[in-house]
């Protein structure tokens, strides 16, 4: 890591006089946010090093690496440029500034912070430049030791790209350790996985280039997945991290990784697939894929049709209890067994499928759909606190009239005063209602976004079938 001070002030000499000491009060150092003075670049050759015209990556937030306030103190005109090799994933940091001074907040020690992010990957410039001339054997070894995942929809348009499944040990574990800085920078809330723990695997998206000296592999992205025990005798597959390198994002590699994982889960009869704290975009892609799979899954059609019919014909304003858009329990189990979609994800996709099946111009059914989303979110956010100590209506279906049959009962008060719900004032309830409606609008907007993507992808699928 290179640190350079642009200008060095002459040292001040002290006088030996006994005059009264003068005290000067300077402005408190406001500091500078790391996001404003630090940039990270991904480079493929030595000529790009020290150039700011190369591929810049956009970390989700650099500030959180620098203390609670995310600021760096004690530097004037600070610039931190970090270059990461796309071949070996080593890094080189160039730090420059005009001068340092303690403005009341001390002088931030940059070296341990950068070491905390980049670890042993961070090397001096000469060594960093030398890494470009060497073949990264651990990438080649990891790919060679793995097995290619072949399934319907895998990279038919570009046979040079493939997904390789490897156990997280040996060369693959070493490769992952090199990728950790990019994971920390680009995957919000991520932490390095424990590669010593049993059950970890990686799926690598690689592009193979055949040369005279042999095959050369370029890493485009990866997923880290964990196989863990599910009682009594099955395995669950949890996706811990998915990362596509910045230049290759938007090319469908993340989608390809998810499809490969689904293929593994079905072919090996995994219990189900889960994702650890997915980002909004990853959840968007995942839901789009799962909705497409569900649309082609015949067992859901009767239940889906029944829900859609209820939304079209039911008048929720006259019901004692709101209609719930919940699929039958046996259908949820069938979906888990056949498609390996877990219950929470299926419920999310179910609402999207219902939305897709409704006519957006039918105001009654769309209003009923929104009412169902509202009731679900109200229950999730407010829980039982929203309905304590009050008269309730419980729908009791009978052979006479399903719409009009109900029972009335009072909820019991909690004896412990500390556990009782504080009665809310009308203005508080109004604010709560407004906030809840805003959240419902956001939820429906997200549902509509996935539905639009699914519709577009369905058209593409139909076009492919016609061409074939």
From Swiss-Prot:
Acetyl-CoA binds at residues 242-244, 249-255. Signal peptide: none annotated. GO terms for biological process: subtelomeric heterochromatin formation. Inhibited by 5 mM of zinc, copper and iron. Unaffected by low concentrations of detergents and irreversibly inactivated by 2% ethanol, isopropanol or dimethyl sulfoxide. Its main location: nucleus. It is found in: Nucleus; Cytoplasm. It catalyses: L-lysyl-[protein] + acetyl-CoA = N(6)-acetyl-L-lysyl-[protein] + CoA + H(+). The record marks 200 as: Interaction with histone H4 N-terminus. Optimum pH is 8.2-8.5. Its EC number is 2.3.1.48. Optimum temperature is 37 degrees Celsius. It is an enzyme of class 2 (transferase). Keywords: Acyltransferase, Cytoplasm, Nucleus, Transferase. One of its GO terms (cellular component) is cytoplasm. GO terms for molecular function: histone H4 acetyltransferase activity. The active site is at 276 (proton donor/acceptor). Acetylates newly synthesized histones during DNA replication. Highly specific in vitro for the non-acetylated H4 which is acetylated sequentially at 'Lys-12' and 'Lys-5' into a di-acetylated form. Belongs to the HAT1 family. Heteromer of HAT1/p50 and p45 subunits. This is Histone acetyltransferase type B catalytic subunit. It comes from Zea mays (Maize). The gene is HAT1.
């Amino acid at each position: 890591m290179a640190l350079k001070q642009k200008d060095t002030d002459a040292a001040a000499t002290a006088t030996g006089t006994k005059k009264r000491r003068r005290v000067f009060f300077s402005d408190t150092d406001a500091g500078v946010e790391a996001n404003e003075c630090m940039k990270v670049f991904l480079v493929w050759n030595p000529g790009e090093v020290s150039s700011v015209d190369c591929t810049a990556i956009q970390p989700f937030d650099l500030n959180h690496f620098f203390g609670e306030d995310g600021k760096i103190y004690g530097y004037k005109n600070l610039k931190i440029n970090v270059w990461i090799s796309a071949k070996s994933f080593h890094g080189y940091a160039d730090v420059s500034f005009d001068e340092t001074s303690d403005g009341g907040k001390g002088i931030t020690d940059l070296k341990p912070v950068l070491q905390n992010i980049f670890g042993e990957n961070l090397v001096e410039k000469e060594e960093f430049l030398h890494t470009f001339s060497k073949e990264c054997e651990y990438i080649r070894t990891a790919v060679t030791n793995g097995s290619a995942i072949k399934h319907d929809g895998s990279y038919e348009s570009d046979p040079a790209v493939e997904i390789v499944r490897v156990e997280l040990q040996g060369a693959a574990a070493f490769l992952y350790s090199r990728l950790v800085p990019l994971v920390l920078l680009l995957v919000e809330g991520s932490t390095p996985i424990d590669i010593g723990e049993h059950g970890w695997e990686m799926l690598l998206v690689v592009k193979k280039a055949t040369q005279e000296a042999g095959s050369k592999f370029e890493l485009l992205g990866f997923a880290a997945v964990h196989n863990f025990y599910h009682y009594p005798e099955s395995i669950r597959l949890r996706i811990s991290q998915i990362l596509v390198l910045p230049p290759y994002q938007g090319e469908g590699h993340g989608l390809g990784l998810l499809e490969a994982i689904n293929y593994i889960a079905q072919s090996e009869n995994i219990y189900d697939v889960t994702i650890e704290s997915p980002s909004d975009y990853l959840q968007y892609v995942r839901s789009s894929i799962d909705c497409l799979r569900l649309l082609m899954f015949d067992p859901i059609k009767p239940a889906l049709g029944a829900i859609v019919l209820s939304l079209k014909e039911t008048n929720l304003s006259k019901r004692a209890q709101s209609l719930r858009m919940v699929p039958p329990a046996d259908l949820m189990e069938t979906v888990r067994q056949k498609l390996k979609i877990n219950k929470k994800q299926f419920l999310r996709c179910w609402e999207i499928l219902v939305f897709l099946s409704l006519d957006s111009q039918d105001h009654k059914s769309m209003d009923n759909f929104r009412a169902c989303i509202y009731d679900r979110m109200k229950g999730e956010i407010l829980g039982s606190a929203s309905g304590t100590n009050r008269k309730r209506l419980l729908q009791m279906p009978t052979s006479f009239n399903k719409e009009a049959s109900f029972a009335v009962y009072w909820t019991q008060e909690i004896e412990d005063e500390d556990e009782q719900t504080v009665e809310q004032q009308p203005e508080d309830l109004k604010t709560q209602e407004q906030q809840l409606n805003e959240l419902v609008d956001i939820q429906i907007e997200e549902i509509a976004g996935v539905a639009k993507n699914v519709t577009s992808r369905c058209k593409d699928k139909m076009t492919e079938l016609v061409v074939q």
